[in-house]
Amino acid sequence: KAYGIIERFSEDIDLTIGRDAPLIFDTLPPMEDGISGKERERRTKALKAAAQSYVESIAFPELATAIERALGTKDGWEVVLDPDDRDAQTILFRYPKLLEYSVGGWGRSYGQSYGAATEGYIKPRIKLEFGARGETEPSEARTITPYLAAEFPDDLPDALVSVSTLSVERTFWEKVTILHALYHGTKLLPEMSRHYYDTMMLAAKGIDDAAKQKPDLLAKVVLNKSLMFADNKASYGTAKLGTLRLAPNDELRARLADDYDAMSEMFMAPPPSFDELMTAIAALETKLNG
């Protein structure tokens, strides 16, 4: 999104809490070399607890205060901790209704009433997923332009914001390893077909060529996931050039097709068909392993 490559709405905002953040700073790094598996597990649990405390005691109240200041009212919206997040590190901003009708091509649920009984794929809330186990490098500062600010720049001159975001090559490898893990049996969750689309779009912009020149970056992504997001089914040991698996098997493909169809309202322009997407992913797998 930060590089203008993904042409769809996002279902969430992923935020990595830096090692120098309050509460996080006091924990020992789980990725440190030379420590035992038990010590790594202990440190990971401590880091998770610190991240939970950071979200609940620092990020949550600051966000709620900032939103109230911006909206000028306490009515029609709320900020809550996501009850469905088992890690207790996600905040939901359920925003007030602005429009009385759906915005063509921008999702049938957009502008839906706050607290409405029915919701589409795009829900009337902003989901902020925090975490401290991910890595923040390599990164660079990028300017984020909201869609409305792009359409009405004179009316929203202060809407642009510079954020530190992961390099696009690292993002590519993060996506590729998700597809690899799904091929090998990692549990498929709702809304995961987006990762196939994102990977295709990154490759279409030539990011695959740039990333392939950085196999060490792929290795870093794999190491982080192996230690911080352990999954016995993911086969991270084979997630390297030559043995990457991106194209899904028939059973997984059928489930992805249904999810991709449901995802259609996230796109602002007609997306590629599911068959076109799968063809592109298969070609990318061959290219990366060649």
Give the positions of each predicted feature.
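Structured mid-to-C-terminal alpha-helical surface segments
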Residues: 3-8, 13, 18-290
